[in-house]
Amino acid sequence: MGVKKKLKLTSLLGLSLLIMTACATNGVTSDITAESADFWSKLVYFFAEIIRFLSFDISIGVGIILFTVLIRTVLLPVFQVQMVASRKMQEAQPRIKALREQYPGRDMESRTKLEQEMRKVFKEMGVRQSDSLWPILIQMPVILALFQALSRVDFLKTGHFLWINLGSVDTTLVLPILAAVFTFLSTWLSNKALSERNGATTAMMYGIPVLIFIFAVYAPGGVALYWTVSNAYQVLQTYFLNNPFKIIAEREAVVQAQKDLENRKRKAKKKAQKTK
């Protein structure tokens, strides 16, 4: 997926999160209980019960933290697919850049040819643009269900964790700031191994945390806690499973090996010329 498309997706995600916030705070406010009949209410209450079970009678906040870790661990294969897709996309960028230089025209024929050649590159390198969307799409109903659980299930909306009323916004802004910081670290680590960067990439790196901060400011404290833990988990996942520093070192090793091979060939050629 190109950077411009990612920016559009990020904007759409931010708008969706704000809409979800409005739905949770200004939408249906009737309580959800074990007797609620519709499917969505049953799903919301099921999530609430999982959180209560994981709280171990210590704190609902502990339950949300463990619930987040559980969700992220279950979704780990999906997120790993996203990370692999992102890495393949990074590796494809030099070839994509060359194609854009080869077909710079804005006419329909040039654009069609460019898209055809780009599809060939993506297919050859095993890049599927949809792989980047799955983690976002899967997490959306989870976050929305958590919104609803914190505003409509009694034992969650009255829960506390440290100084936070989990059913209300965090007026101290500590959690929104932490959510933004961990989002930035996650994005920064993901972009660290990029062989090429541009203004759009930088805009994403700073823009996504801003969107998350705004979202977390107006969200219930429990949702801000979920987002903070989720992105902290993402930082650890990226570092241990897709370490950008290791990727950079491997890339530099390949470049150095190529230089060494060229130097040996050059020396061998000079030596052969001297013996003639």
Swiss-Prot record:
The keyword Nucleotide-binding does not apply. The chain crosses the membrane at residues 58-78, 130-150, 169-189, 207-227. GO terms for biological process: protein insertion into membrane; protein transport. It comes from the Bacteria. It is a multi-pass membrane protein. It is found in: Cell membrane. A lipid is attached at residue 23 (N-palmitoyl cysteine). GO terms for molecular function: membrane insertase activity. Residues 1-22 form the signal peptide. Disruption phenotype: Alters the localization of KhpB which localizes not only to the midcell but also the old cell poles. No change in localization of MltG. InterPro entries: YidC/ALB3/OXA1/COX18, YidC/Oxa/ALB_C, YidC/YidC1/YidC2_Firmicutes, YidC_ALB_C. The keyword Signal applies. GO terms for cellular component: plasma membrane. A lipid is attached at residue 23 (S-diacylglycerol cysteine). Keywords: Cell membrane, Chaperone, Lipoprotein, Membrane, Palmitate, Protein transport, Signal, Transmembrane, Transmembrane helix, Transport. Belongs to the OXA1/ALB3/YidC family. Type 2 subfamily. Interacts with KhpB (also called EloR/Jag). Required for the insertion and/or proper folding and/or complex formation of integral membrane proteins into the membrane. Involved in integration of membrane proteins that insert both dependently and independently of the Sec translocase complex, as well as at least some lipoproteins. This is Membrane protein insertase YidC 2.
